[in-house]
Amino acid sequence: MRHRKSGRQLNRNSSHRKAMFSNMAGSLVKHEIIKTTLPKAKELRRVIEPLITLAKTDSVANRRLAFARTRDNEVVGKLFSEIGPRNADRPGGYTRILKCGFRTGDNAPMAYIELVGRPATSEAVQEDAQSAE
């Protein structure tokens, strides 16, 4: 029986899952939007939200905790210098999941997961303008 067991297994063992979500969290912090399957996006939300909450108060101890979870100094730096202060007044809900259809090949439901307060890049604005014409 699997009563009160939280989290998705995603057909991986625990070390693979931990490494995958560590890498995905780092990618999300670097790029601020990533495309993945819907179940992975929903699970990633459980990993990244506490990291951003941790980044709201900058201290050596919090930086070490974030590094222990991501293993990337560049990610920790961006987390504490940009993303944490940007969400200082937001009480949770730092990510948004947008469904984007199904993957060709295996028909897996796909989704974009993005950070809520992310600035619109000039490249994305230019692409939207070109596609609208």
Swiss-Prot record:
InterPro entries: Ribosomal_bL17, Ribosomal_bL17_CS, Ribosomal_bL17_sf. One of its GO terms (cellular component) is cytosolic large ribosomal subunit. The keyword Ribosomal protein applies. SUPFAM superfamilies: Prokaryotic ribosomal protein L17 (SSF64263). Part of the 50S ribosomal subunit. Contacts protein L32. Keywords: Ribonucleoprotein, Ribosomal protein. PROSITE patterns: RIBOSOMAL_L17. It comes from the Bacteria. It comes from Pseudoalteromonas translucida (strain TAC 125). The keyword DNA-binding does not apply. This is Large ribosomal subunit protein bL17. GO terms for molecular function: structural constituent of ribosome. Belongs to the bacterial ribosomal protein bL17 family.
